[in-house]
């Protein structure tokens, strides 16, 4: 089943739906005890969900070899569509060997629950170092994305998938808004232009500034924090969501913003992941996407505006979503407001640069981020969470 409501077309033209019908689900359940089974990790589980709900349209499953190779090499699927991140299911030789192409495979979540089915069309080996270098720009195992590639299995399992059923998110059910629902929500609000914002950090003042700048020129903001797998030192999703709720309640016009969770896992692939994040938001119905400083970056692996420059490699019609590029915002002590070099006459010493990394470092030291960094209610929530975490 492929469908979408009015508005911007999903990537590839159709919104993919790989959630099993009641009849399909019963068929899978009847055969469950006779199917070979594999246990998915947190990232593979979230990838299965994103494929099933259409967030990764046009993908209907995990990539076959030909698509995998063109994505790694050229950031395109074999049909020419732009796709910058390989979405694969990697397992060990021991797990892959007994599996036969053409058969169904039962997919279990990390707790062992039966959640999906893979129609195994291919199993193939791949070059981990080559994937790391092309996708992440480095073979350094200290890079969290590269580390995942090196530690995962040596064989990719490919083929279409089905999600047994769409369950409510255990922590954030009210913010679980799938692409078909976000598109309907935009339509009901009469929004024709919607800007998406990706984040794995609590909203600090620089984020708030660029979101509101974008909101000045579009109908609505789709605030879409990622709640899938992240680095261990990233601030936990439940803490971040409470911060977003505070911001929504006190600092944003609620009729112009929709807050929803993004169940994806972070890859930390910098420029390539920026393209990926934009295409995912296009599937959710966004017409624009905010690309800020070092989007989806980690450490010093990528240049400050390398992710923004990546968008210039593609024709606008190939992406089908408009990147809104913002310079590094800072708090200007001369004008006492948020600004960038485009709007502030300040000297370097009059600029307080903000980042999620700086906020995390202050919290670890037990310091309350100043109002130039973070809204006071958000700062209080963060410091309270860190104190409770230490107990």
UniProtKB/Swiss-Prot annotation:
Record bears the keyword ATP-binding: yes
Pfam short name (any one): ATP-sulfurylase
Enzyme Commission (EC) number: 2.7.7.4
Pathway(s) where this gene product acts: Sulfur metabolism; hydrogen sulfide biosynthesis; sulfite from sulfate: step 1/3
Superkingdom, taxonomy of origin: Bacteria
BP terms from Gene Ontology: hydrogen sulfide biosynthetic process; sulfate assimilation
Keyword Iron-sulfur: no
Keyword vocabulary terms for this entry: ATP-binding, Nucleotide-binding, Nucleotidyltransferase, Transferase
One of the record's GO molecular function terms: ATP binding
Catalytic reaction equation(s): sulfate + ATP + H(+) = adenosine 5'-phosphosulfate + diphosphate
InterPro entries cross-referenced by the UniProt entry: ATP-Sase_PUA-like_dom, PUA-like_sf, Rossmann-like_a/b/a_fold, SO4_adenylyltransferase_pro, Sulfurylase_cat_dom, Sulphate_adenylyltransferase
Gene3D superfamilies xref list: HUPs, Sulfate adenylyltransferase
Family: Belongs to the sulfate adenylyltransferase family.
Protein name per UniProt: Sulfate adenylyltransferase
Organism: Rippkaea orientalis (strain PCC 8801 / RF-1)
Higher taxonomy: Bacteria, Bacillati, Cyanobacteriota, Cyanophyceae, Oscillatoriophycideae
């Amino acid at each position: 089943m492929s469908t979408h409501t009015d508005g911007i077309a999903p990537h590839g033209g159709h919104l993919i739906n790989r959630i099993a019908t009641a009849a399909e689900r019963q068929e899978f359940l009847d055969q469950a005890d006779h199917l070979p089974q594999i246990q998915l990790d947190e990232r593979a589980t979230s990838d299965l969900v994103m494929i099933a709900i259409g967030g990764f349209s046009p993908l209907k499953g995990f990539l076959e070899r030909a698509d995998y190779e063109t994505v790694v090499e050229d950031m395109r699927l074999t049909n020419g569509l732009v796709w910058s991140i390989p979405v694969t299911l990697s397992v060990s030789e021991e797990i892959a060997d007994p599996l036969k192409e053409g058969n169904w495979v039962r997919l279990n979540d990390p707790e062992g629950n039966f959640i999906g089915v893979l129609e195994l069309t291919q199993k193939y080996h791949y070059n981990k170092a080559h994937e790391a270098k092309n996708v992440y720009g480095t073979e350094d195992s200290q890079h969290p994305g590269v580390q995942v590639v090196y530690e995962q299995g040596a064989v990719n399992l490919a083929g279409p998938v089905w999600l047994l059923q769409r369950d409510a998110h255990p922590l954030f059910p009210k913010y679980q808004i799938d692409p078909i629902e976000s598109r309907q929500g935009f339509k009901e609000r009469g929004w024709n232009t919607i800007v998406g914002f990706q984040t794995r950090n609590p909203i600090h003042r620089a984020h708030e500034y660029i979101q509101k700048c974008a909101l000045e020129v579009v109908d609505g903001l789709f605030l879409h924090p990622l709640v899938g797998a992240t680095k261990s030192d990233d601030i936990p999703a439940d803490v971040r969501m409470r911060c977003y709720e505070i911001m929504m309640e006190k600092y944003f016009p609620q009729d112009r913003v929709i807050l929803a969770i993004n169940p994806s896992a972070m890859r930390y692939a910098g420029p390539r992941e920026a393209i990926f994040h934009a295409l995912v938001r296009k599937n959710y119905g966004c017409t624009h996407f905010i690309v800020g400083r070092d989007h989806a970056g980690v450490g010093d692996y990528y240049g400050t505006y390398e992710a923004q420059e990546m968008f210039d490699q593609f024709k606008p019609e190939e992406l089908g979503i408009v990147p809104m590029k913002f310079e590094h915002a800072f708090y200007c002590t001369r004008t006492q407001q948020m600004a960038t070099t485009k709007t502030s006459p300040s000297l370097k010493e009059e600029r307080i640069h903000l980042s999620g990394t700086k906020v995390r470092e202050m919290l670890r030291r037990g310091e309350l981020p100043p109002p130039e960094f973070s809204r006071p209610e958000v700062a209080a929530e963060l410091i309270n969470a860190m104190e409770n975490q230490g107990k």
